[in-house]
Each structure stands twice: as C-alpha cells, then as structure tokens.
C-alpha cells in the first residue's frame, strides 16, 4: 500500500500485527504484501501501517521464560527443553512487552477458495537459533504450532477466512 510508513522505529511494548495487505497491479490483478499494523501508539498518535524493514521489535529481559516441568508434554517442545530459557512474546497481552499478532483482515478471500498460506522463516540468527509461533491449547489441550524454524513442515500459517490471531512467539536465548 502507498500509505506505508518507512521511517525506522523500534517498538518495545503494545499491540501490533503482522498484516497481509491486498492491493492490485496495473491490470487489476490482486497483489499481496506484508506490513506491520502498529497499534502501539508509541511512535505515532494513531494506528499506522509500517513497512517490515522499518520496524525493529525490542524484546527485553522481562520476556525471558524458563520452560517449567508442568509443561513437559512434548507438544510444548517448541519452547525448548524443560528448564531451558527462551524469550516469549505471549499469546495474551502484557502491557510491558510488545504483543505481536497476525492478521489477514485486509484480504478478500472470495477468489481464494483454498485459503492462504503465509510462509514464515528465520532470516538470520546465531548458530542454533530458532523462532516459533504457537497457540496454547485450550482447556488443557495440546498447543497448535503454526511455525517452527527447526521444522520444515511448520513453515507456513494457513488461513481460510479473514483472521486476526495472537499466539506465543518464541525466540531462542
């Protein structure tokens, strides 16, 4: 979209979404791109769309999480080994941590009967680094892992309708 802000910002708290945007090329054919919908109101007075390269998320020590024994079910291996630490941006909002979600609310699914697969990958990091995105199981159920950079079968987030979701974003320590 032409209304994307490109001035570099660092966001360290508040709500934002990785958002799929839909436009059209010169022939009217739909085109899609990713942007950050910044609702933090820390670098602007209102919600704004930002280009991905212009946004840095600051993850501070208060996001450090050690996997407890109570989450020893293998479904939670996305957090690393029991007793291991990682940085987690949680599924539920914590006002002291950046709270990223995922949104396809700007996509018209009428011409997409099979839905949309959004590929996700870890671009860079130290040796052995990983990133993941999962939603906690409800009522004691197993978590749903949407993305795990260590598992090629978990490299896309699939949606079949307009979606706004939050999950746990995990980054190795």
Where is each model-derived feature located?
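Phosphate/adenylate-binding glycine loop and adjacent helical scaffold
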Residues: 1-152, 156, 160-163
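Hydrophobic/aromatic beta-strand elements that line small-molecule binding cavities or substrate pockets
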Residues: 169
């Amino acid at each position: 979209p032409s209304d994307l802000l490109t001035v570099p910002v660092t966001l360290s708290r508040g709500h934002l979404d990785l958002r799929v945007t839909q436009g059209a090329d010169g022939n009217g054919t739909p085109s899609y791109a990713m942007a950050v919908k910044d609702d933090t109101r820390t670098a602007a007075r209102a919600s704004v769309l930002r280009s991905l390269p212009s946004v840095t998320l600051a993850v501070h020590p208060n996001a450090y999480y050690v996997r407890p024994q109570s989450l020893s079910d293998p479904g939670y291996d996305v957090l690393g080994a029991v007793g291991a630490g990682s940085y987690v941006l949680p599924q539920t909002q914590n006002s002291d941590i950046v709270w990223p979600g995922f949104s396809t609310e700007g996509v018209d699914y009428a011409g997409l009967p099979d839905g949309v697969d959004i590929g996700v990958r870890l671009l860079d990091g130290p040796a052995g680094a990983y990133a993941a995105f999962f939603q906690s199981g409800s009522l004691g159920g197993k978590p749903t892992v949407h993305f795990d950079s260590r598992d090629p079968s978990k490299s896309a987030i699939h949606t079949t309708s307009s979606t706004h979701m939050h999950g746990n974003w995990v980054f190795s320590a």
